[in-house]
Amino acid sequence: MSERAPVVTIDGPSGAGKGTISQLLAQHLGWQLLDSGAIYRVLALAAIHHDVELENEESITLLAAHLDVKFLTGNDKDPVQVILEGEDVTTDIRTQECSNAASKVAAFPRVREALLRRQRAFRTAPGLIADGRDMGTVVFPTAPAKLYLTASAEERAQRRYNQLQDKGFDVNIERLLSEIIERDERDMNRPVAPLVPAEDAFVIDTSGKGIDEVLELALKHINEKLSSAN
């Protein structure tokens, strides 16, 4: 890891626009991209590919320490393209099998510690955009610029509904809203790494704002913070 490489953390609840803004910032700045929300799914898929037993903490930990994963800027439907061992697995990691496996591997403390180190290794020149839920509080607490994106539960449910509809899924918006509210409650009150803004984070409420407006606010804050850090 290069401590000199700047890192911008982007935290917040699901549907607040983190993925899209992270992609656009990485493109604009020409920096590396980390989608921490996908990394446990990627590890689970790697375990499945290599026939590693999901109950074997030692083997999963070893796999996590050497996980060959890259995150590239994607497109409108998938803002982040996930590459595992040279293969595009953006769609593969979204299956229910992978989701269930991710929950299993995430339960191991040694696996979580290995993935924490692996995530920090993404901090390389010229810089890193780190998208997640505890990037500014746990993974990169000394990051020079931290953003926290949020939006009303109703707006986030509508965004998720539109996204899934565009992909051909038949979804119920009331159920999506209920799931978002439940997840918010769970994430914000969990004992380890709760979903809260870092004390020095710049909070952007994306409700009613277009992508360009949010991007402009983010870039203005990042430029100010990086200028004062140099």
UniProtKB/Swiss-Prot annotation:
Q: State the species of origin.
A: Shewanella sp. (strain W3-18-1)
Q: Which Gene3D superfamilies match?
A: P-loop containing nucleotide triphosphate hydrolases
* Superkingdom, taxonomy of origin: Bacteria
Q: What is this protein called?
A: Cytidylate kinase
Q: Name one GO cellular component term.
A: cytosol
Q: Which compartment or compartments is the protein found in?
A: Cytoplasm
Q: Which CDD domains match?
A: CMPK
Please cite one Gene Ontology biological process associated with this protein: pyrimidine nucleotide metabolic process
